[in-house]
């Protein structure tokens, strides 16, 4: 979590790491490819990881920009991936970007945008008459929660139910920071948010069930979640997205992550 306080790590918030370990799509057979780096005192100072699918790999997260540490991290990826290695790095990570360039890597393409919302701004919202916002202390129904996410991200059919232990595997999840717009006992929109301490809260991409869109529910769900994080000490909220919706409700570009590789490297996103 200390890594999350550094702006060059904001494209891979700790919430992504916790969520992937609970996700049913996690490539569990690749978990041994995750590498931790420790300093002489045993503190974790570096992480090489992927996000849920091993195809989305090459994230280098670090709390120290010492050359020796970054050298070890780069060499570890090269030993695993060979010359086809791709590393996903925030443009704010000036030291790591410079070292990659010196080693013959090139910036390939953008692989993520981080948007930021200043929580000192107004977070007021309106709810249509037919809808209510889930209160603090709300015990979400797991099936309704799953349906809201499934439909809200435009998936067809009926999903296979999550295992009972699914959400229990997330150690720092805060149920009060999950918000739902509800009508007639149906969860119509949902925003999940991750926060423990520090300045930054992490917003999951908001989901609205198609037949309930264009009613301000997504904005309401995001603003309510951010209001609750602000009350706990957060000063800003970030989301990994470049959708116009977030700009319309006050988010602004904070940083971008790029894939770095050599001429013969793979071109995975």
Regions found by a protein language model. Name each.
Residues 45-46, 109-111, 189, 255:
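A structural microfeature
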Residues 1-3, 132-145:
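A short beta-loop-alpha structural element at the N-terminal edge
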Residues 4-81, 183-184, 188-204, 209:
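Conserved donor-binding loop and adjoining core beta-sheet/short helix segment
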Residues 81-92, 229-241:
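Conserved GNAT acetyl-CoA-binding A-motif
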Residues 63-72, 97, 206-220, 230-232, ...:
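Conserved glycine-rich acetyl-CoA-binding loop
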Residues 149-192:
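A mid-sequence, solvent-exposed acidic-amphipathic segment
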Residues 51-129, 257-263:
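Acyl-donor-binding surface of acyltransferase catalytic domains
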Residues 98-101, 246-247, 251-252:
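Conserved active-site tyrosine of GNAT-family acetyltransferases
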């Amino acid at each position: 979590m200390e890594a999350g306080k550094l702006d060059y790590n904001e494209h891979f918030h700790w919430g992504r790491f916790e969520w992937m370990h609970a996700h049913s799509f996690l490539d569990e057979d690749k978990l041994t490819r995750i590498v931790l780096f420790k300093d002489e005192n045993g503190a974790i100072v570096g992480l090489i990881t992927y996000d849920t699918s091993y195809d989305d790999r090459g994230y280098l997260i670090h709390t120290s920009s010492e050359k020796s540490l970054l050298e070890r991290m780069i060499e570890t990826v090269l030993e695993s991936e060979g010359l086809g290695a791709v590393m996903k790095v925030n443009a704010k990570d000036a030291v790591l970007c410079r070292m990659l360039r010196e080693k013959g890597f090139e910036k390939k393409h953008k692989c993520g945008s981080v948007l930021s919302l200043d929580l000192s701004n107004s977070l007021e919202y309106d709810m249509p008459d037919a809808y209510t916002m889930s209160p603090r202390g709300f015990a979400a129904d797991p099936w309704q929660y799953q349906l809201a996410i499934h439909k809200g991200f435009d998936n067809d059919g009926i999903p296979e139910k999550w295992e009972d232990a699914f959400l229990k595997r997330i150690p720092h999840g805060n149920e009060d920071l999950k918000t739902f717009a509800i009508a007639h006992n149906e969860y119509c929109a949902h925003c999940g948010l991750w926060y423990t301490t520090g300045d930054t809260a992490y917003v999951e991409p908001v989901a609205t069930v198609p037949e309930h869109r264009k009613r301000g529910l997504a904005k309401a769900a995001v603003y309510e979640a951010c209001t609750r994080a602000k009350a706990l000490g957060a000063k800003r909220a970030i989301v990994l997205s470049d959708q116009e919706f977030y700009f319309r409700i006050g988010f602004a570009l904070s940083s971008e992550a790029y894939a770095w590789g050599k001429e013969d490297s793979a071109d995975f996103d």
